[in-house]
Design a protein with these regions (language model features):
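Short, conserved catalytic or interaction motifs in soluble domains
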Residues: 50
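DNA major-groove recognition helix of helix-turn-helix/homeodomain DNA-binding modules
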Residues: 58-73
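Short alpha-helical DNA-recognition segment
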Residues: 29-47
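A short, Lys/Arg-rich alpha-helix, primarily the initiator
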Residues: 1-29
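Short amphipathic recognition helices of helix-turn-helix/homeodomain-type DNA-binding modules
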Residues: 73-82
């Protein structure tokens, strides 16, 4: 019996960096600390911002809800793919 190889996850480092930069931009524009946002959203903001973890769409949605943004407003200023 042959076992299937696990699928390799596709990673796009440029996209990851672009999303993280947008999260930092929004958080900083409100003068919020990583800890403040983490405490109020339950998200691990420090891990996202250091690149240790990548936010899922659900995490991005929670982040947007906290800042009263739509996903469209979050992604609109991004120039991706470059």
């Amino acid at each position: 019996m042959m076992s299937e190889k696990p699928k390799k996850q596709r990673r796009d480092e440029v996209l990851y960096k672009t999303i993280i930069e947008r999260m930092i931009e929004i958080r900083s524009s409100y003068g919020h600390t990583q800890e403040y946002v983490a405490h109020n959203t339950g998200l691990d903001i420090p891990h996202f911002e250091t690149g240790r973890d990548f936010p899922t769409m659900t995490s991005i949605s929670v982040f947007c809800e906290f800042y009263n943004l739509t996903l469209g407003e979050f992604f609109a200023p991004m120039n991706y793919p470059p």
